[in-house]
Amino acid sequence: MQIIRTIKELENFVQNASGKIGFVPTMGALHDGHVSLIKKCVSENETSIVSTFVNPTQFLPGEDLDKYPRKEQSDIQICEQNGVSAIFIPDANELYFEDEPLIVAPKKLSTILEGKTRPGHFDGVLRVLNKLFRLTRANSVYMGKKDTQQLIIVQNMIKTFFLNIELVACDIVREPDGLALSSRNVYICDEDKCNALRLSRSLNKALNLIQNGEEDASEIKANMLEVLEPLKVDYVAVTDRNLNEISKVEKGNTIILVAAYVGKTRLIDNIWI
């Protein structure tokens, strides 16, 4: 496996790569959720690239950029163990320039849910991914459904800029108790763990209601909020696959999303119905 830190090295690697190129963009601190993406990427492509870059442009002032977990040696080891062809570990100065043209996320998609709480976040996400997609010349990109809004906005960018990329949406990986895996889970102390489980339990409550015939979105959200007490809830939403709020669940075209604070840590989760 090659360890790549500069754009020049990456360009040389890609130029000499054989077959289809699969790409897994991450911010490092790799966990089993990332590993599931990596394994799928490696199994479906002759060449696989993983990036581990804590992207400063997607963090808002006062967010956790400085304390976001960084585990470079562990990330390298995980990629090696799973057969990755190359890991790209750039510095911010390698990717960003002064006065460069910016990509702005579509207003409708980027100002709801996560975007309402984190204005400008998705602009930063698209800014770095547009660069990484072009640098890696990826045929397929693997991203998780945990960041559903990001997934949908990235698909929109791929379509808008006519990028010849297949975006592969991969299922959420959970701990045995149901907690969705996230690099930010390291912030959760033991006494807060039970409260963190309220997110997945609220989604399970919604799923059980739907399986028993409930279709009314308001009723589903009310039941979820009961499970989420006493957390500080950012949002509970029932939407279609384009993130439009809906009043009635339609199986095969519904996403239920939740965001809440556990202590000072903000967690997100969702299920696709």
From Swiss-Prot:
(R)-pantoate binds at Q58, Q150. One of its GO terms (biological process) is pantothenate biosynthetic process. GO terms for molecular function: ATP binding; pantoate-beta-alanine ligase activity. It catalyses: (R)-pantoate + beta-alanine + ATP = (R)-pantothenate + AMP + diphosphate + H(+). SUPFAM superfamilies: Nucleotidylyl transferase (SSF52374). Its main location: cytoplasm. Beta-alanine binds at Q58. It is found in: Cytoplasm. This is Pantothenate synthetase. It comes from Campylobacter concisus (strain 13826). The gene is panC.
